[in-house]
């Protein structure tokens, strides 16, 4: 089977038309190809065709790159959607009763994520958020070297992993949650049966675990398998631990809670939250909605299953940091480590 290496990954072609489509994606990507191939650039944000930003070394930087026009950018996104078979706007077989999809959420062959919106919901024009897949998995020592956390914090988390604690990593977009989870997973015994579940595969660690399985639940036309369905399916695969890429819905939270109470230990998940306390509240609300519990009961159930919350933060002032590590107890949240923004130092509260 014929294949070709592109900047966005290697592709094996089923037919010549498929190669033409990928060739066109690469060709039309020319305005940002230098940004995409820069190993120091982690994210590319296209706010409008002529308003492009990147994240480099943890900092937001405006660049002079631009597409020729709004129509050129829009055509590139439509081509990506068609080639990757993702719903976006009106497809070729569109019927009047069909829904229009103004948001594209897709993954390049190498795992880079691309999210785009049409002018239907971003009136100034097509917007794009492109998160590049890292070329190498960072080590714990490298994260310490980047001042993302301290050796003491890393040792604490490593011990928690080996004690099979259930850990939730929370933070804003681009705060390093996935990177840190990847490091934590590689602290695990390579002989365990680990199952990862993600909307879009980003962890890419299963090759290190001979018994491991990776589930993915991307949006696909006529495919009835969302994140909650995949999480539930892990129970029948006899996992030793389950890692869920990100919980964003009540049904996914309920399915994850069900896994945690079913005898599987050392589980990990991530979600968006601005503090450990708000993470508990958010998880409780999700569980309340999906399970029909009162909020008080849902919060109690969450506290019983979550052992540690790791707060990650991306801040324009000081970049990426683990801003807090908190132990979850029945009646309190106990801060173990925190980052002092005023003094720019980490504190050990033990």
Residue ranges and their predicted role:
Residues 164-167, 183-304, 311-314:
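Switch/coupling sub-region of P-loop NTPases
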Residues 26-38, 107, 291-299:
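Short aromatic-glycine motifs in intrinsically disordered, low-complexity regions
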Residues 177:
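Conserved lysine of the Walker
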Residues 303-350:
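Conserved P-loop NTPase
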Residues 55, 60-163:
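P-loop NTP-binding catalytic core
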